[in-house]
């Protein structure tokens, strides 16, 4: 999955697959986690948020289970 860079201290990049509704997050420490059944507006919100980390913590961590990829 192609990920786009994010200007953030903790998140390096994020990508989204419309067909599977999978959100991938690459963290600054190199970990990559996948979040399943994520609505497209959640991904768009993350990418446009003034604080991607705050958005991630408020809207993704609380509502979706992560599977570690790397």
Which residues does each PLM region occupy?
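Acidic/histidine-enriched, beta-strand-rich ligand/metal-binding domains
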Residues: 1-70
């Amino acid at each position: 999955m192609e990920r786009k860079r994010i200007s953030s201290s903790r998140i390096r990049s994020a990508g989204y697959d419309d067909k599977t509704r999978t959100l991938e997050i690459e963290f600054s420490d190199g970990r990559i986690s996948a979040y399943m059944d994520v609505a497209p507006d959640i991904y768009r919100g993350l990418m446009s948020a003034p604080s991607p980390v705050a958005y991630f913590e408020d809207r993704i961590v609380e509502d979706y289970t992560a599977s570690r990829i790397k």
